Swiss-Prot record:
The lineage of its organism: Bacteria, Pseudomonadati, Pseudomonadota, Betaproteobacteria, Neisseriales. It comes from Chromobacterium violaceum (strain ATCC 12472 / DSM 30191 / JCM 1249 / CCUG 213 / NBRC 12614 / NCIMB 9131 / NCTC 9757 / MK). The keyword Cell cycle applies. Residues 22-100 are periplasmic. Keywords: Cell cycle, Cell division, Cell inner membrane, Cell membrane, Coiled coil, Membrane, Transmembrane, Transmembrane helix. This is Cell division protein FtsB. Essential cell division protein. May link together the upstream cell division proteins, which are predominantly cytoplasmic, with the downstream cell division proteins, which are predominantly periplasmic.
Length: 100
């Protein structure tokens, strides 16, 4: 009887081993599922980024307002006859504010 029990336990363990630790085991499935979720999150971020870039490209191709806005904000350009005023916040530049 003892021999039969040992044999059955051994057979059960031999059958369960690939299920838990083999190539297609539950652990591997769990790892792949986690990796898939991370990939989906990354893909979602990239899709949102691509949509924003696509909208910006379409805006630059179709309208001059976007080009003018970028020229003003990024390059500091102004139109003829305009005067540019730059107001500095004294609380953000303590070294200049302390000299007054």
């Amino acid at each position: 009887m003892r021999w039969l029990t040992v044999t059955l336990v051994t057979v059960i363990l031999a059958l369960q081993w690939p299920l838990w630790f083999g190539k297609g085991s539950w652990l591997r499935v769990w790892q792949l599922d986690k990796q898939l979720q991370e990939q989906r999150a990354t893909t979602q971020k990239l899709v949102a980024r691509n949509a924003a870039l696509d909208a910006e490209v379409r805006d630059l191709k179709q309208g001059s307002d976007a080009i003018e806005e970028r020229a003003r904000n990024e390059l500091g350009m102004i139109r003829n006859g305009e005067v540019f005023f730059q107001l500095l916040d004294p609380s953000k530049n303590p070294s200049r504010a302390s000299h007054r």
